[in-house]
């Protein structure tokens, strides 16, 4: 399988290039960065592209890849419901193309989201805290937003979080994602971390995941690269590849 990388000179992108080159069953074709022509992916007969770029360019990248029949594995964040809908519309015209978009490729992070969804209906209160390096472009992180949505869906028949706060500085209680408070921290020295805090009478539960190095994303990305062509259309998250759905 012939694999290209968009954002190849970025920190995550460079890690993906090394991972593809080290895989016996994959062939690295080309890396494309800002200012480079996307046509290089066609010229090198690339089958699958790994995209770790920026929310401001990822939609243009996807339109090009779908139009040219190149499968995409996307780790770039910033996908709103509207963006997901747009990708689905593009794919409807290209039924042979496949796109997998995941808010997080670290297996532990995916499992922590799954565990949080399972725990959600057993606790009265829940909040999400995500912690990242200060160069991250979006807040809250895609992982935190998806975690909150999964928790909210699991709690749809439950009352809202109890919270008597009536006054305070704007933003002090975090962002609201489908009724779940989400707090974002940006701090030098961090990579990618998340805590989900549950509370009820007499007990609390904390589910925490830490990516200490960007290599934590590699197993999930390579799994997606190998499987994406088997799933025409749009797949969100690697949970289906791990039999977690």
Curated annotation (Swiss-Prot):
NAD(+) binds at residues 7-12, 75-77, 102-105. It holds the Pfam family DapB_N. GO terms for molecular function: 4-hydroxy-tetrahydrodipicolinate reductase; NAD binding; NADP binding; oxidoreductase activity, acting on CH or CH2 groups, NAD or NADP as acceptor. The active site is at residues 132, 136. It catalyses: (S)-2,3,4,5-tetrahydrodipicolinate + NAD(+) + H2O = (2S,4S)-4-hydroxy-2,3,4,5-tetrahydrodipicolinate + NADH + H(+); (S)-2,3,4,5-tetrahydrodipicolinate + NADP(+) + H2O = (2S,4S)-4-hydroxy-2,3,4,5-tetrahydrodipicolinate + NADPH + H(+). The keyword Nucleotide-binding does not apply. The keyword Transmembrane does not apply. (S)-2,3,4,5-tetrahydrodipicolinate binds at residues 133, 142-143. It is an enzyme of class 1 (oxidoreductase). GO terms for cellular component: cytosol. Its EC number is 1.17.1.8. Catalyzes the conversion of 4-hydroxy-tetrahydrodipicolinate (HTPA) to tetrahydrodipicolinate. PANTHER family: 4-HYDROXY-TETRAHYDRODIPICOLINATE REDUCTASE 1, CHLOROPLASTIC-RELATED, DIHYDRODIPICOLINATE REDUCTASE. This is 4-hydroxy-tetrahydrodipicolinate reductase. The gene is dapB.
